[in-house]
Amino acid sequence: MFTMKKSLLFLFFLGTISLSLCEQERGADEDDGGEEVKRGIFSLFKAGAKFFGKNLLKEAGKAGAEHLACKAANQC
């Protein structure tokens, strides 16, 4: 009886350690997935800022050039 209890306790111990290792790996995989999402959101934000910045500077450049042409021709 004592031998059977020992072996059952040993199997329970091995199963617990195995389950613990699986949970740690699963947690590490979930953490890596979160980083990818963060990078994805950051790159999306970066691309949007670049697009709006480029268009905004282009429009500001046009307005500035028109204003300078107006001043040069004294038509303002």
Curated annotation (Swiss-Prot):
Lineage, broadest ranks: Eukaryota, Metazoa, Chordata, Craniata, Vertebrata
InterPro entries reported for this sequence: Frog_antimicrobial_propeptide (IPR004275)
Signal peptide location: 1-22
Protein name per UniProt: Esculentin-2SN1
Propeptide: 23-37
Keyword Disulfide bond appears in the UniProt entry: yes
Top-level taxonomic group: Eukaryota
Disulfide bonds: C70-C76
Subcellular location: Secreted
Organism: Sylvirana spinulosa
Entry keywords, A to Z: Amphibian defense peptide, Antibiotic, Antimicrobial, Cleavage on pair of basic residues, Cytolysis, Disulfide bond, Hemolysis, Secreted, Signal
Coiled coil regions, renumbered to chain: none
Family: Belongs to the frog skin active peptide (FSAP) family. Esculentin subfamily.
Tissue-by-tissue expression: Expressed by the skin glands.
GO aspect biological process, one term: defense response to Gram-negative bacterium
Function: Antimicrobial peptide. Active against some Gram-negative and a variety of Gram-positive bacterial strains. Not active against fungi. Shows very weak hemolytic activity against human erythrocytes.
One Gene Ontology cellular component: extracellular region
